[in-house]
Regions:
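Short pre-active-site segment immediately N-terminal to the catalytic Zn-binding motif
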Residues: 489-503
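C-terminal accessory module of base-excision DNA glycosylases/AP lyases that mediates lesion recognition
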Residues: 381-416, 471-477, 499-509, 517-618
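Class I S-adenosyl-L-methionine
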Residues: 68-72, 89-281
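Core alpha/beta nucleotide-donor-binding catalytic domains of modification enzymes
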Residues: 2-125, 135-139, 143-146
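C-terminal target-recognition/interaction regions appended to catalytic cores
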Residues: 234-382
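Short beta-strands and strand-loop turn motifs
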Residues: 130-134, 345, 509-510
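Conserved small-residue
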Residues: 15, 44, 78-81, 117, ...
Length: 618
């Protein structure tokens, strides 16, 4: 790409241009951006060439126009961070149907902004896509938006990689987690950039900036400055690198809000470890049980807390580590890795809001550079999420095979719950006998007195001397609860838990294995929660060759890894159940039986086992 000149990029929902700046530092030329906030648009237009437009991307006609521009301009990378609004489960059901059927969006007058972002990509087919967003976009129970995006991008020929990253591992001096999704056309593999364990501390980032009083303003208004002595650390030198020579001893935007006298006294009594409730009573103007973190002095030797748009309101979360005031605009910009020559349009509150809403330029830089490196040295991405799900579902749907968790096929929420409570990790003999007993008594809450007594006796005999005697009592307790409320089994995960007192993982599994059609009093379709229990992380870790899936961030990396194997197409539920069964039948903690696994030809661990024992796979 580089040989023909700078590759072109578009940045949608661009804000002030943090992502745009990082992409340009990486080698892209940003020629098109769109946002809907006037101050941010003017900031972007000041710093970048091309078009910085105020267009409403929820309008289908605008989306079509933007896609045409992307094609006409020959844009290589479409980037952005679309806001994601919550939407109803009925909306999810309709969208799930359209995704599974491979249908395009109807020409709705308005739409969710993430759908607009995806529609631009589907219409323009750029070589690369980069999306940055909050982790919550991906980590709801069903991971619905992320799974939908991956499915649709794969349908049009992209390979997709996604990860929740810690921005500090790429040189950003704050604790800031972000979802990064990269899609490359023609099944080219994206390789995430290497991380660092070295943290850039708050003082390393801002320690060179001069002391100022809260509320101080320089002469000259927006053209005024504070006297600046010079950078000390490598990070500070990088922030000053493009400051024009006449301004080498000036720092702009080094202003903050005035400080109330009682706040100043409170700030002076604080260290970075002080909680709001630790302050003396005369300094607590808010209820401590509600505002327990109302004030936060930054630790100069550690990362800053996440810089958010909230800093535009009062700044109490961002008290300077040494001075009794909140951060200045320039200090907040530094912690977001905006260089000192980057100015913001509007009053301080608008500048703070632009900074808090921005993608850290340094994060944009490392991701942009990694995209260019992946495109310049193209490698095949291997098996897609859709194909992986197809293999798992095909194996799951086979009738003539051994079963580790037979209740998953029962289509009965009661049998799933009872199987988990009574027979989880049971011996083969106990599993066979216990499963037959549960099948014979598939509605124990409806048994008459004599029948219930016989069922209880059979359970007691089954579990005698097995260490599972208490599980007999648990099954009978669950049956008694259902006698009072048998309809609970048709409810949501929350309703099942409330009625039966089972673990969330058990209720999730019951809902996944035995979906229900929506009831008249509820708009929801069948739920598909993404489960990381029952050994599925082990399978995902081995399959993808990523040990972090099991060892670090199970609720983020782990859930993303599982979602990457099951997709959200018409086979996703079967694929998910197949993944759970596979973990318990063949992909064991010790001595996995890779020769029986349907994923072996595409599995990192499978390749290792094949090389060690080639005769088993002939």
């Amino acid at each position: 790409m580089k040989a023909a000149g700078a590759p072109l990029a578009a940045d949608f929902f661009s804000g002030a241009g943090g992502l745009s700046l990082g992409l340009e530092q990486a080698g892209f030329k940003v020629i098109l951006s769109a946002d809907h906030e006037p101050f941010a648009i003017r900031t972007h237009a000041h710093h970048f060439g091309g078009m910085s437009v105020d267009w409403d991307l929820s309008d289908a006609n605008v989306v079509e126009r933007v896609a045409e521009l992307v094609v006409a301009a020959g844009i290589d990378l479409v980037a952005g961070g679309p806001p994601c609004q919550p939407f109803s489960k009925a909306g999810r059901s309709m969208l799930r149907y359209r995704v599974q059927a491979g249908l395009r969006d109807p020409h709705d007058e308005r739409r969710d902004l993430w759908r607009s972002f995806l529609e631009i990509i589907e219409r323009s087919r750029p070589r690369a896509v980069l999306m940055e967003n909050v982790p919550d976009m991906a980590l709801d129970r069903e991971m619905f938006i992320l799974r939908s995006m991956v499915e649709e991008l794969e349908q049009i020929g992209y390979s997709v990689e996604e990860r929740v990253v810690d921005a500090w591992r790429y040189g950003v001096p704050q604790f800031r987690q972000r979802l990064i999704l990269v899609a490359l056309r023609d099944n080219v593999q994206f390789r995430f950039p290497a991380e660092t364990e070295e943290k850039v501390s708050v003082w390393t980032a801002i320690g060179d900036l001069p002391e100022v009083e809260g509320g101080w303003r320089p002469e000259g208004g927006e053209y005024g400055w504070a006297e600046y002595a010079g950078p000390v650390t490598k990070f500070q030198r990088e922030m000053r690198a493009k400051v024009p020579a006449p301004d080498q001893h000036k720092v702009f935007d080094h202003i903050t809000r005035p400080v109330r006298e009682d706040d100043r006294q409170a700030f002076e009594s604080m260290t970075h470890a002080t909680k709001y409730t630790d302050l003396s009573k005369e300094h607590q103007r808010y209820r401590g049980d509600i505002f327990d973190d109302k004030y936060n002095r930054l630790n100069e030797n550690d990362l800053s807390r996440t810089i958010t748009a909230h800093i535009a309101k009062d700044g109490y979360w961002y008290i300077h580590p040494r001075q009794s005031r909140t951060l200045t605009v320039r200090e907040a910009a530094r912690l977001q890795t905006f260089p000192d020559n980057f100015r913001f349009d509007g009053p301080p509150s608008a500048a703070f809001r632009q900074i808090g809403n921005a993608v850290p330029p340094r994060l944009g830089f490392v991701m942009g550079k990694a995209i260019l490196e992946s495109l310049d040295d193209p490698r095949d991405a291997g098996i897609s999420t859709k194909k992986t799900a197809e293999l798992l579902a095909e194996w799951w749907l086979k009738k003539d095979r051994e079963e580790a968790l037979p209740w998953l096929r029962s289509c009965s929420r009661w049998l799933v719950i009872a199987g988990e409570e009574l027979l989880d990790r049971a011996s083969r003999t106990l599993l066979r006998q216990g499963w037959k007993l549960l099948q014979r008594n598939d509605k124990p809450w409806a048994l008459k007195s004599a029948q219930r007594t016989r069922f209880a006796d059979e359970l007691a005999f089954l579990t005698e001397n097995s260490g599972r005697e208490q599980r007999t009592d648990r099954i009978l307790e669950l049956a008694d609860r259902l006698k009072k409320n048998p309809a609970a089994l048709d409810g949501s995960v929350g309703e099942i838990r409330a009625a039966l007192g089972v673990a969330e993982s058990v209720a999730d599994l019951a809902v996944l294995a035995a979906p229900r059609e929506p009831r008249e009093d509820r708009e929801a379709g069948p739920e598909e929660p993404v489960l990381i229990t029952k050994g599925v992380l082990r399978v995902a870790s081995r399959f993808q060759g990523n040990l972090d899936v099991e060892r670090r961030n199970r609720m983020t990396d782990g859930r993303l890894a599982v979602a990457r194997m099951i997709g959200i197409g018409e086979l996703s539920r079967s694929a998910h159940l197949g993944l759970i069964e596979l973990a318990n039948l063949w992909c064991r903690p010790v001595t996995p039986v890779c020769s029986e696994c349907p994923l072996t030809p595409h599995c990192n661990e499978g390749h290792r086992q094949r090389n060690m024992n080639p005769t088993l796979y002939d």
